[in-house]
Amino acid sequence: MAGPPRLLLLPLLLALARGLPGALAAQEVQQSPHCTTVPVGASVNITCSTSGGLRGIYLRQLGPQPQDIIYYEDGVVPTTDRRFRGRIDFSGSQDNLTITMHRLQLSDTGTYTCQAITEVNVYGSGTLVLVTEEQSQGWHRCSDAPPRASALPAPPTGSALPDPQTASALPDPPAASALPAALAVISFLLGLGLGVACVLARTQIKKLCSWRDKNSAACVVYEDMSHSRCNTLSSPNQYQ
């Protein structure tokens, strides 16, 4: 009787397997633009479009320490990071949301990506925002390729380039004169270790002999030999 139910489950599993790629594709996030260059004080629009079941959407600024800029959910008051408070506007719904960032500063330069909150988190391709000074706006060009997560540029500043004279004035590496001092320290540590070993050996011998007959000749000879050996190691060199 167990055979027919198993055979009925097989077509159901195959149907689920066929529908899984379509469900994952439906959760893809479309983001535009890929790159934009704006002067200081201007605004930029970032659009996040997705289809399928969606709980909400984040806009994150990538970098060494990713930062959530906004969180938007239909019917809920949007959450905005303190740095962008009063500079963010929304239009549309969470399925097709346009985020407008106003009064951009040089420190706002970075890569921003849409993160759709679904059964599995899905990310957009990212938008590279280059905020430049007005006189240098023509120096920066955007490519049509989506930005990479690691392509976070630093805010353009004129003082970022090192002074050639300062760069050539780096301190030289330490000379080899530190080698004798290192050898002296190593020799001192070796001598200290040998002294501690001799003290421990004599202590162990005394404990061993106390367990045996104290009149035993073997213990007396062994202890005398250990004592003479430690004295030989600790005696100074007459030829130095």
UniProtKB/Swiss-Prot annotation:
Residues 26-130 form the Ig-like domain. Sequence repeats lie at residues 145-153, 154-162, 163-171, 172-180. Expressed on T-cells and natural killer (NK) cells and their precursors. Residues 140-172 are annotated as: Disordered. CDD domains: IgV. It comes from Homo sapiens (Human). Its main location: membrane. One of its GO terms (cellular component) is plasma membrane. Residues 145-180 are annotated as: 4 X 9 AA tandem repeats, potential spacer function. One of its GO terms (molecular function) is transmembrane signaling receptor activity. It holds the Pfam family V-set. This is T-cell antigen CD7.
